[in-house]
UniProtKB/Swiss-Prot annotation:
InterPro entries: Alkanesulphonate_mOase_FMN-dep, Luciferase-like_dom, Luciferase-like_sf, SsuD_RutA_monooxygenase. The gene is ssuD. Keywords: Flavoprotein, FMN, Monooxygenase, Oxidoreductase. Belongs to the SsuD family. This is Alkanesulfonate monooxygenase. It comes from Cupriavidus taiwanensis (strain DSM 17343 / BCRC 17206 / CCUG 44338 / CIP 107171 / LMG 19424 / R1). GO terms for biological process: alkanesulfonate catabolic process. Gene3D superfamilies: Luciferase-like domain (3.20.20.30). Catalyzes the desulfonation of aliphatic sulfonates. The keyword Isomerase does not apply. Its EC number is 1.14.14.5.
Length: 390
């Protein structure tokens, strides 16, 4: 099991849908979140993409310099950059970060945003172009280790003599992650992707998606790894966790929810449609209606696009729900919580000790652990706190 955190380059807050409790985007804060994730033993961080975010490549490059082990899941956008340019960017980042790059292929689903960036392809054509983009990207980086060049003639993209002179450290290329819920997305994942990501739907729905991707992968003689994107709201008691969930959306009003849902309804995204269906387009607002599966809460999606569900509960319950997803075949969990700095600590301290040995070991054996840090404050100048009971 690998646990990732999230860098909130679009801003952060204690509440959704209001400026109350909000934190402005700034590098000092993003650095705090990244260093916390690195220090606490998270495997890596997802850096989001889109017009509401700071540029992920610039942010990742800056954060790589202030972290030691943390991996960076960074977006490439077919249609917005050439595949050979993206290959050079990936190779350079991988080299300067000592092999800490992971690629998140993002086709996009917001028509207004895509058109604002000059991309006017429909859904089917975007996936055709994305498949061609990824074929070129993968081939160019694989060939770079031997100094070879690549020719490719496709419907949307063509290159002749494409090459990268300085290959990435990871062979044949940094691993590719990708999420999508439509049939073309599953086909693309099965053919070319290393790890398929899904947003946090109920386990039965997730299992169906994973099985479909497996079928596509089998046609190409491949196997694909799986990951899930979720928010988390964990507290020492179940009641406290649900109170925190209610508090997160306590500042929302009907107009704010309606305006957000109108934007989502105009998106050309099967994944966003499935997220909206979980809360009936914002019309389900009670805790009972928003708990769409045991401890899986759709309240975040009332106003947040993309990943709109959270696991809510005490540490043991949240850990058990993660194990349920792991039993489906998921081994990468990309998590987040509001505010992201405090919740990175809270999740690591409360849930990491309950996760598989590989995760616990990273948290327990962090370099530089001292008695006055993770073991608590030394009392009366010489009394070390007793060990917690696991």
């Amino acid at each position: 099991m690998q646990v990732f955190w999230f860098i909130p380059t679009h801003g952060d807050s204690r509440y959704l849908g209001t400026s109350e409790g909000a934190r402005a985007v700034g590098f000092d804060y993003l650095r705090q979140v990244a260093v916390a994730a690195d220090t606490l033993g998270y495997e890596g961080v997802l850096i989001p993409t889109g017009r509401s975010c700071e540029d992920p490549w610039v942010v990742a490059s800056a954060l790589a310099a202030v972290t030691q082990r943390l991996k960076f899941l960074v977006a490439v956008r077919p249609g917005l950059m050439a595949p050979t340019l993206a290959a050079r960017m990936a190779a350079t980042f991988d080299r300067i970060s000592n092999g800490r790059l992971l690629i998140n292929l993002v086709t996009g689903g917001d028509r207004a945003e895509l058109e604002g960036d000059g991309l006017f392809l429909d859904h089917a054509a975007r996936y055709e172009a994305s498949a061609e983009f990824l074929r070129i990207w993968r081939q160019v980086l694989a060939a770079s280790h031997d100094g070879d060049k690549v020719d490719y003639d496709g419907k949307h993209l063509s290159v002749k003599g494409a090459t990268v002179l300085y290959p990435p450290l990871q062979r044949p290329h940094p691993p590719v992650y990708f999420g999508g819920s439509s049939a073309p997305a599953h086909a693309l994942a099965g053919e070319q992707v290393d790890t398929y990501l899904t947003w946090g739907e109920p386990p039965a729905a997730v299992a169906q998606k994973l099985d479909d991707v497996r079928r596509h992968a089998a046609r190409h003689g491949r196997t694909v790894k799986f990951g899930i994107r979720l928010h988390v709201i964990v507290r020492e008691t179940d009641a406290a966790a649900w109170a925190a969930a209610e508090d997160l959306i306590s500042r929302l009003d009907d107009d704010t929810v309606a305006r957000a849902q109108a934007v989502f309804a105009n998106m050309d995204s099967e994944g966003q449609r499935r997220m909206a269906a979980l809360h009936a387009g914002g019309t389900r607002r009670t805790r009972e209606a928003l708990e769409i599966s045991p401890n899986l809460w759709a309240g975040v999606g009332l106003v947040r696009g993309g990943a709109g569900t959270a696991l809510v509960g005490d540490p043991a319950t949240v850990a058990e729900r993660l194990r349920e997803y792991a039993a489906l075949g998921i081994d990468t969990f990309v998590l987040s919580g509001y505010p992201h700095l405090e919740e990175a600590y809270r999740f690591a301290e409360l849930v990491f000790p309950l996760l598989p040995r590989a995760v616990r070991a990273k948290f327990d054996n962090l370099p530089g652990k001292v008695l006055s840090g993770p073991f608590g404050e030394v009392m009366a100048t010489g009394i070390v706190p007793r060990a917690a009971q696991s």
